Design a protein with these regions (language model features):
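Asp-based, Mg2+/Mn2+-dependent phosphohydrolase catalytic module
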Residues: 2-16, 21-42, 55-75, 82-264
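Conserved phosphate/oxyanion-binding catalytic-loop motifs
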Residues: 50
Length: 264
């Protein structure tokens, strides 16, 4: 593994779940990391596969934890999904299973809801997920709708442990229809390029930070960025042995970054 000169990096793309917080609890060192980003005038963007929350809700969540991060510093897989659909098929219609973050993102890009003959079936994390909605989605795909997933995460951390995430929820539709979904969140390079463009950075000037090898690290690596795997979420050091690629740096948590930057 290499080292990273964090002081020399211009932009930071950072995951949230398992990196900044776990459920409704802020992780050790997260506040110090965010304050360091702000105090040193780094460009930063929280790039999350969480499709359920809007940027405003994410801002409010961190505010309740004592952190002030403006809404423009969040980019979610729901926003990436809405951008993809608006670019591919302006004015299209969808049957969507998801929370406010996904539904609002779709509406904001002029995408309409349609449960009769939609162009796409779009699935994100959804508390309303049920056998009825699953059956509806399956039959719409069989009738010709294209299947879209907000992200390819199979699970995510919660206060209770682990919860199934988007890929686990969309899998029954894939199996029942024989159709493969297209996933818009990390590690899709479209989401990474959008993040870099929002930061105003080239890949060599940026760092990708996350707790997952299969989304965060690979997306950063394939985009040409330095990568940091933190062990505060779903990964352990043993996780590294499961993959053919490696992050640039492995840290216990993001709180290590300002400490390493101070050491030079």
């Amino acid at each position: 593994m290499e080292t990273i000169d964090f002081n020399a990096k211009k932009g930071f793309l950072c995951d949230m779940d398992g990196v900044i917080y776990h459920g409704n609890h802020i992780l050790p060192g997260a506040a110090e990391f965010i304050h360091w980003l702000q105090d040193t005038h780094k460009e930063y963007l929280f790039l999350t596969n969480n499709s359920g929350m809007t940027p405003r809700e994410l801002h409010q969540k961190l505010w309740r934890m004592g952190l002030d991060v403006p809404e423009e510093h969040f980019y979610t897989s729901a926003l990436a999904t809405a951008t993809f659909l608006a670019d591919q098929a302006p004015g299209c219609s969808v049957y969507a299973l998801g929370e406010a973050g996904l539904l609002n993102a779709l509406y904001d890009r002029g995408i309409t809801m349609n449960d009769v003959n939609p162009d796409y079936v779009v699935i994100g994390e959804a508390r309303a997920y049920s056998l009825d909605t699953l059956t509806k989605a399956t039959n719409l795909v069989l009738a010709g709708a294209k299947l879209i997933g907000a992200n390819s995460d199979t699970c995510g951390p919660t206060d209770e442990g682990i919860a199934p995430a988007c890929r686990a929820l969309i899998a029954p539709v894939e199996i029942a229809t024989g159709k493969q979904a297209y996933f818009c969140g990390k590690p899709n390079p479209l989401m990474m390029r959008t993040g870099l463009r929002m930061l105003g950075c080239h890949s060599g000037e940026a760092v990708m930070i996350g707790d997952r090898m299969d989304t965060d690290v690979i997306s950063g690596m394939e985009s040409g960025m330095a990568t940091v795997l933190v062990l505060s979420g779903v990964s352990t050091r043993a996780t590294l042995d499961e993959f053919a690629y490696r992050p640039s740096v492995v840290l216990d948590g993001v709180g290590d970054i300002p400490r390493l930057a101070q050491q030079g």
